[in-house]
Amino acid sequence: MKIDFNTLFPSSTKEYISGTIYNNIKVGMRRIHINDNSESILTYDTGGPHTDQKIKIDINQGIEKIRLNWIVDRQDVEYHKRQEVNTNSEYAFPLQSNNILKANSNKPITQMYYARNNIITPEMEYVAIRENALRQKILSYKPTVMAPEITPEFVRQEIASGRAIIPANVNHPESEPMIIGKNFLVKINANIGNSVVSSSIEDELQKMIYAIIYGADTVMDLSTGNNIHNIREWIIRNSPVPIGTVPIYQALNKVNGVVGDLDFNIFKKTLIEQAEQGVDYFTIHAGVLKNYIDYTDNRLTGIVSRGGAIMAHWCTIHNKENFLYTNFEEICDIMKHYDITFSLGDGLRPGSIADANDTAQFLELKTLGELTDIAWKHDCQVMIEGPGHVPMHLIKENVEKQVHFCKEAPFYTLGPLTTDIAPGYDHITSAIGAAIIGWYGTSMLCYVTPKEHLGLPNIQDVKDGVIAYKIAAHAADLAKGNPSAYIRDYALSYARFNFKWYDQFNLSLDPETAKSLHDESLPSENAKSAHFCSMCGPKFCSMKLTHQIKSIEE
């Protein structure tokens, strides 16, 4: 399953930057070589060992556990026997360990706890290097103004305040630390996962690898079909990015899809099972309160969140309050002993433009703010999930209310889709909203693929969704004034104006596609040095004419 990195990203090499506080830190970055290899720029890389051609990966063994020593050296964890899970051995990960890590006392082992106690962890230095390295540019035509350096101390302060998170379960030591917060690069998430209708373990593992190679910062496994536990194990053991899940899906699977048979004990066992596997963040739909359900009655599309609909159905069947809400402190107690991050789910998000910014949506958001306070009291890391389907003129209100209710906890939104009329193109309708909401301060954007509302995404859909959202996140970073975003735009525009076609391809988000589109009309090698393309031809190229004007003036 090794992908040819040199084909996808020509003229790129993997490079590692060492830490200074912790000298055993090695942060992987991608260097793009340009100007006939005389210059280069450094870019953020999410692929881990999957984008290092020097590393041989055996997916049956998983990838290197780069954080294991950092975790053990803190001396606040101990090994426990993993709870037994009935899995189909035919599909099980072959090297599944029976030992897991957990806090050795009642003290939290979260990045927030360390940050609040003035401890800079290796994870904090790691993300500071990742965020800051892009600003260290060796191009001669660099911008004159650079923003202040992102230091490990700044990272610590942001995490202590709750404005940023590092999802990093101690049982996922393979993950390369990354940070989600409005004062950092805008991140993107890719959803994968099987259904009862389609897909296999191999398919989902391949989707994960493609997603991170093209730039997904986190991946959510939303499997609802067969072999949920096994799929997740394969993904986690081979993933260098944080993995998120919606545990209520597997809990419902355990009761054969009968919502009324769910209870907190089943959910709790599922939570611990996934915590022991190494899931880095959980979507918990604890804000769907019984009294809020009636507010969805007049909606055009009702409740469109799967988790939200499950919990609303359960509340209605039993005429009781949401057990995720009533047992929230106990959930916090589990999370803090593994350092699992809350992704507080928007179970009442709007599923159509007609339902955007309604009472149900904002009642739930207010409750998520109250739950954030409770989680922070336990030193648990938190991000807040957001919509959904929102027209452009209503997007800003979502961010303003989230900041107010949730006290600047990172916002994580699904798009939002800005119109409902384009099935098959919802990666575009949503990337428009994602760019806008990212500009307003959303920290992570959950991708939408062309298959949204139509079916289970395949590998090409995953790639298309990731690229669309890398564009949205990058556009938001530009609008926010992030210098690392500006650098790459500047370099590509320089290459374009000077007809350096290979540099233009290689600096793009998808070099393979850029080159293939150019090759459709001008496939010859000579065309790669021509001062025109097939759009204008040699006589009408505005940039060529501009060069001629300059030569006359000189």
UniProtKB/Swiss-Prot annotation:
Cofactor notes: Binds 1 [4Fe-4S] cluster per subunit. The cluster is coordinated with 3 cysteines and an exchangeable S-adenosyl-L-methionine.
GO-annotated biological processes: thiamine biosynthetic process; thiamine diphosphate biosynthetic process
Residues holding substrate: N191, M220, Y249, H285, S305, R306, G307, D346, G347, L348, R349, E385, Y412
Gene Ontology terms: cellular component: cytosol
Binding-site residues, Zn(2+): H389, H453
Class in the EC hierarchy, top level: lyase
Pfam families to which the protein is assigned, alphabetical: ThiC-associated, ThiC_Rad_SAM
Co-factor requirement: [4Fe-4S] cluster
Pathway: Cofactor biosynthesis; thiamine diphosphate biosynthesis
Entry keyword set: 4Fe-4S, Iron, Iron-sulfur, Lyase, Metal-binding, S-adenosyl-L-methionine, Thiamine biosynthesis, Zinc
Reaction catalyzed: 5-amino-1-(5-phospho-beta-D-ribosyl)imidazole + S-adenosyl-L-methionine = 4-amino-2-methyl-5-(phosphooxymethyl)pyrimidine + CO + 5'-deoxyadenosine + formate + L-methionine + 3 H(+)
An annotated Gene Ontology molecular function: zinc ion binding
Binding-site residues, [4Fe-4S] cluster: C533, C536, C541
Database matches in InterPro entries: ThiC, ThiC-associated_dom, ThiC/Bza_core_dom, ThiC/BzaA/B
Quaternary structure and partners: Homodimer.
Primary role: Catalyzes the synthesis of the hydroxymethylpyrimidine phosphate (HMP-P) moiety of thiamine from aminoimidazole ribotide (AIR) in a radical S-adenosyl-L-methionine (SAM)-dependent reaction.
Family designation: Belongs to the ThiC family.
Record NCBIfam families: PRK09284.1 (NF006763), PRK13352.1 (NF009895), thiC (TIGR00190)
Protein name per Swiss-Prot or TrEMBL: Phosphomethylpyrimidine synthase
Gene name of the encoded protein: thiC
